[in-house]
Design a protein with these regions (language model features):
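Bacterial N-terminal signal peptides
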Residues: 10-21
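Acidic, glycine-rich low-complexity/disordered segments
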Residues: 312-323
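Acidic, metal/ion-coordinating pockets
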Residues: 27-309, 316, 338-350, 360, ...
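Bacterial N-terminal signal peptides that target proteins for export
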Residues: 2-12
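Glycine-rich phosphate/diphosphate-binding loops and the adjacent beta-loop-alpha structural elements
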Residues: 321-342
Length: 541
């Protein structure tokens, strides 16, 4: 890292730490003070209203929701209800996830999000997508501070952002610690986080104690981007935390998860939801807690006209390209199943057809709102794949494929949250997998077939996936020691465009490429019980 960049980072930390208020007398000693913590997570640069899929209450429904202008309406209503007693936060994965974000390295998100008047934010695992320099630049362009207790400059070892912020809200001192995903260097392509280093949860106890003893806060909040299962584990192991506000796994917690005196929540994704925590503070004690997951449906919240204008002005130069029709689908394409999705069946088919291999693999991404039946536009393609990566092919033996699936399934369904890693189950084409989610580690896979035939352990198979920039040359989709690896001149976007041109209108994929023998066909969550009442292994207690 250059001396200039190191200086900029050090200055940003110093300035923000200077903003942290000095200790004052504990507020609310005589009369209880009502406070609202409101937050969003995993916006993924979805600036405009979009189709959203709702399933809470037992009925599946698709409705228009979200958009930054609709978020603005909702948060302003809460601010009017509790003037001066609202803290609005963002739990990360904000500047990645759409064409507008990708084409501007996240800059298109800045003005619309600034219009929301956030109090603070943390970086998510995708904030590194444009590199460390851009991460710091975008954080500096937002009007709210960014905090992260475990993100360091790899060379200087100094924190990139302050570890915490103390905000006085309605006379109540609230200490917020930021904690981002320490798995980023392995989870994302290695080049994304070059120049950065990440610490684990061991940094947190000292900071909690510092907030309580030195800063004399009334409330301690842990704002995380490590996913709900790991956030629950943090609540179980850390002392002195009142609320863990989780992001990353896009989970929708309609009821709080309670661990001792700590509440854990997560507010969905894509700007389709806001999470609201109401509580009172008297004599430095938190009481009367209430959680609400607010669905930002179009029929419940109008768009704020001033913020809508900001979004329109931001997107205006890109609209012709965003609106280009590149295909059609007769059925909705969605990414709302932990095990298999209609959208990713299409994408893995497109990669395999473009490369002419026996097997295609697409990552188990969580991002992208639903694509409704009808025209498929360029904007949809960038929601599906918000980064442009070339295709990479190679040869792998059957035993390598089996080891890959054992490892990937354990990353999704491990009973120990610390073993969870990345997104959802990988999405195959030309291959089917049957597994038991509740089986012991290393024995999850029941059957693998390629081209309809049982997997042969020593046979070589041809495989295509997206290149991960910074990986070893012989690694393909996290499979090491691949033979004859080769990067194609074709990227994933063009592969999908060509596939849509040949196969539109798309019909609903047949599915059942990946089947859990001990789970229902649709699994919406890695945490909550299934409709049959059986908990997915990652659900913990």
């Amino acid at each position: 890292m250059s001396a200039r960049k190191s200086t900029i980072i050090s200055m940003s930390v110093g300035l923000l730490l200077a903003v942290v208020a000095a200790p004052t007398a504990i507020a609310g000693e005589s009369e209880p003070v009502s406070i609202s913590l409101v937050y969003m997570a995993d916006l993924h640069a979805q600036l405009e209203p979009h189709a959203e899929f709702f399933w809470h209450g037992g009925e599946d429904e698709t409705a228009t929701a979200g958009g930054v202008a609709r978020i603005a309406t909702a948060i302003e209503a809460i601010r009017r209800e509790r003037p001066g007693r609202v803290l609005f936060m963002d739990a990360g994965d904000t500047i990645q996830g759409s064409a507008a974000a990708a084409w501007t390295e996240g800059k298109a998100v800045v003005a619309p999000v600034n219009a929301l008047k956030l109090g603070l934010a943390i970086p998510g695992n995708w904030e590194v997508v444009y590199g460390a320099k851009v991460l710091v630049e975008r954080a500096g362009e937002f009007r709210h501070p960014t905090i992260a207790a475990n993100l360091r400059d790899a060379k200087s070892k100094k924190l990139v952002f302050p570890p915490y912020l103390v905000k006085e809200v309605g006379g109540v001192r609230i200490g917020v610690i930021g904690f981002t995903d320490p798995d980023v260097p392995e989870r994302q392509p290695p080049s994304y986080s070059k120049g950065l280093a990440f610490d684990g949860a061991g940094v947190l106890p000292t900071l909690i104690d510092e907030l309580r003893r030195k800063e004399k806060v009334d409330v301690v909040v842990l704002l995380t981007h490590v996913g709900l299962p790991k956030s629950i584990r943090l609540a179980e192991t850390l002392k002195g935390v009142d609320f863990v506000l989780s992001g990353d796994t896009h989970e929708r917690t309609y009821e709080p998860i309670v661990r001792g005196e700590t509440w854990v929540v997560e507010p969905g994704s894509f700007g389709s939801f806001l999470g609201r925590l109401d509580f009172t503070v008297k004599g430095g004690k938190v009481a009367d807690r209430k959680w609400e997951l607010i669905e930002l449906r179009a029929d419940r919240f109008a768009e704020d006209p001033l913020v809508k204008r900001v979004v329109d002005e931001t997107l205006a130069p890109m609209r012709p390209k965003l609106a280009e029709v590149i295909g059609h689908t007769q059925a909705p394409l969605m990414r709302y199943n932990v095990v298999e999705t209609s959208l990713d069946d299409v994408l893995s088919d497109a990669l395999r057809e473009a490369a002419g291999t026996e097997i295609g693999l697409s990552n188990g991404f969580r991002f992208s709102p639903p694509t409704a039946a009808g025209p498929i536009r360029e904007s949809d393609l960038w929601d599906w794949y918000p980064i442009s990566t070339r295709l990479k092919v190679g040869k792998v033996k059957g035993r390598q494929l089996r080891a890959f699936w054992e490892r990937e399934l354990e990353h999704v369904f491990a009973s120990d949250p610390e073993k969870l890693f990345g997104g959802w189950v990988p999405r195959p084409s030309g291959m089917t997998v049957r597994f038991a989610a509740h089986a012991p580690e290393g024995r999850l896979v029941r059957e693998i077939r390629v081209g309809g035939e049982p997997l042969e352990e020593e046979r070589e198979y041809t495989l295509v996936a997206c290149e991960r920039e910074g990986d070893e040359p012989d690694k393909l989709c996290r499979i090491p020691h691949v033979r004859e690896p080769r990067v194609l001149g074709l990227d994933a976007h063009e592969a999908v465009r060509q596939y849509l041109a040949r196969h539109s209108p798309l019909s609903a994929p047949e599915g059942e490429r990946v089947v859990a023998v001990d789970l229902p066909s649709v699994v919406r969550s890695q945490v909550f019980p299934t409709p049959e009442g059986r908990a997915v292994r990652a659900g913990g207690k």
